[in-house]
Amino acid sequence: MRFTATAAALVASSIPATLGQHVRDLSNEKWTLSSDALNHTVPGNLPSHAHLDLLKAGVIDDPYHGLNDFNLRWIPESNWTYTTDKIKDLMPIEFCGKYVASTNNQYRQYSFDVSQILEGCNEDPILKIDFGSAPNIVNAIAEDRNSPVWPDGIQQTYEYPNRWFMRKEQSDFGWDWGPAFAPAGPWKPAYIVQLPKAQNIHVLNTDLDIYRKGQINHLPPDQSQPWVVNASIDFVGSLPPNPSMSIEFKDTKSGEILTSKRIGNVTVSGNSVTGVTVLGGVTPKLWWPLGLGDQNLYNITVTVTGHQNQTLAHVTKRTGFRTIFLNQRNITDAQLAQGIAPGANWHFEVNGHEFYAKGSNIIPPDAFWPRVTEARMARLFDAVVAGNQNMLRVWSSGIYLHDFIYDLADERGILLWSEFEFSDALYPVDDAFLDNIAAEVVYNVRRVNHHPSLALWAGGNEIESLMLPTVERKAPEEYAKYVGEYEKLYISLILPLVYQNTRSITYSPSSTTEGYLDVDLSAPVPMVERYHNTTPGSYYGDTDFYNYDSSVSFNSHVYPVGRFANEFGYHSMPSLQTWQQAVDPEDLHFNSTTVMLRNHHYPAGGTFTDNFHNTSLGMGEMTIAVQRYYPIPNKLDSVANFSAWCHATQLFQADMYKSEIQFYRRGSGMPERQLGSLYWQLEDIWQAPSWAGIEYGGRWKVLHYVSRDIYQPIIVSPFWNYTTGDLDLYVTSDLWESAKGKVNLTWLDLSGTPLPHNAGTPGSVPFNVGALNTTKIYSTNIKNLTLPNPKDAILVLSLSGEGHLPNSDKKTTFTHQNHFTPVFPKDLALVDPGLELSYNTKSKTFTVEAKSGVSLYTWLDYPADVVGYFDENAFVLLPGQKKEIGFTVQEDNTDGKWVQGVTVQSLWNQTLEK
């Protein structure tokens, strides 16, 4: 690489479109990868990881195959050098043989002035980046006598220990749903930028904050106030005195210019230039989440000019006008009068409207981020939209999501609850660590602030709800100390930094919290957390809930009653097709060594390769759940039996999530006024047992189909107390206006014959359900029904109603179907439904028909080498009923031949030997 010795900077991170001259993308350069662990070099790439380059060079097999997460540990335990910057891990950087800098935070953007080094460089410049072994580095830090030591039994180690000392993706060190590859490498792009003269700048980052006049993060904005735009640009270089700024908003659909104006109050502070303007006299179209309105977007162009009107910087970002607010305020007298229980709110409001948040938690989609493409994430987010989800909680500790992922969410109306990267651990609070965190927070808050999909900033995952109670239980004498450290990091440090860089987003110190008592931004601890200051009979905060005692999985009395459910779930196995991507044929049985050791629930707690005791507990939980509630597979062919067992675990998982989601959604009309359900978890990081609804590669589990169904706007739900026999039917709606209609109740035996007198229940029940509410439409006790044989009976519930979707004048017809059986599926007197499947080449749809009996959990499956989803799946099909079902192809490597491999089965097939 040859450069002129003018002002030059190494910049590591994504780079915005600006007027910076001579920008060289280092991804286009030739790189080599070397290590003492190898006796030769291999070609490298940027961005990349050592694992990926070694795989491409043929040095290693697929890291995801078999037990390679164990076999390839020599890679993360070695040092690696990329020669010829998002810079990851602790790594010295050399340019022209001269030391440039060391970095210690994967989440920051770094820029370095190398002009003097370049000026003295008499040879072709060589850039060298050394990556130390992350596991070795954190262990060395832990052994330093000056490093903090926490009480025994507090810190959560999954595989590699001491992750909390490094600002690196925490799940790189292992988690209970993923491997511990701890990859090293330049995981984001890097650039060399040359500025040809003084008073010329290059844009590093942009903060565009759009909010209502007078808006404060933790208070509801006044929707009658005009919009305010605060535009701030971070740069390298130097600005001339008294620069000017202007903005232009252009509708991305129509191309119409909303407004174009010069910004007043331009200030320069350090390497940032900022201007603020009020958009008076304009009425932009609002951005709404999925199902609540349109996703109206605008391109905002910010231009910085000098005193002679020459353009110094020019940045265009896509944005939207919306307010999003997490309401944690005390319940008002007006709410009490409506029957809402006392305590405090915990729900989101968009553009002044409270709404029901329906969604899940997203984890890293891959252990190696450089191979996560926009197309791959688009497929995932299309599945989110198809699943009727309007919010994802971006779990920490993965990474702060790339801008292109926020772009995908902006387009699709998916709100992203975002978090700072701290999870299930206590962290250092020394000055150097806090300074590092401060830079990380400021960079990322500013970077993503223009995205209308951004819903919240939370301080971290389960710090308040898990870590502090663990300290209180195991080291009560030190509880006050660690509460103080928690507040120092998450409240005294991070909260003010968020407030200083955005007025449009609420901040919560922890993902699961009881909320706050008071906010005083002038106080040393600006937010007073509620902690244990609660009153019996009152509700506060959000909940997470995991109970692996499957004997109570369908007992709604054990589910937490709260304002918002942000985590809940149970694990299941991926499908046979997904297992076959990573596991050898001889290992395709439920308790093979490979299958068991790829299950990290429960985690090893260290770098053990014989975690059979802990993993057998998790495998046993799935096994016992299936045995309790579903027919036990016993097929003669071992692979077919393995596949049937995998499917059975998915049936249990889906039914359990359905039971909980119905309960939480019903809470919208209960005293708890519950307004959110985000289950754990959306997708997988690799092929293994987990809580995911979408497998690695994109195949939907039963869960994602079932959650899509139960996340529809209006649903009918049965609630059965199997101890007392009480059966209640509810209609729940998340519309913003009342809706009315009827629910048909049809009792049948499993051959499809109607039961006499409809078993003593009415044939239909009318309903009128209020806005964002629920209503009980029928109540009885199973003992009062005239059921000839409870094992040979099913109640089919069919809802039809009318209402208006939010922000729509058009009346819409809503339908939903549910069912109830008076015994659990394993005790049903199943009959062969006689399923037949056909395909129409013209309409490209499948038709499924049940010829001889009720088909429960009707399941269409497709072969490997294609990715997509059916319009409907895991449904009830009655005798003589035909259902036409389409299939959305997201990726096809079969040239259309996959159609020939589509199959259909039902719960009946789980009872067969073949």
Curated annotation (Swiss-Prot):
The active site is at residue 462. Belongs to the glycosyl hydrolase 2 family. Beta-mannosidase A subfamily. Pathway: Glycan metabolism; N-glycan degradation. It comes from Aspergillus oryzae (strain ATCC 42149 / RIB 40) (Yellow koji mold). The keyword Protein biosynthesis does not apply. Keywords: Carbohydrate metabolism, Glycoprotein, Glycosidase, Hydrolase, Polysaccharide degradation, Secreted, Signal. It catalyses: Hydrolysis of terminal, non-reducing beta-D-mannose residues in beta-D-mannosides. Homodimer. Its EC number is 3.2.1.25. This is Beta-mannosidase A. It is found in: Secreted.
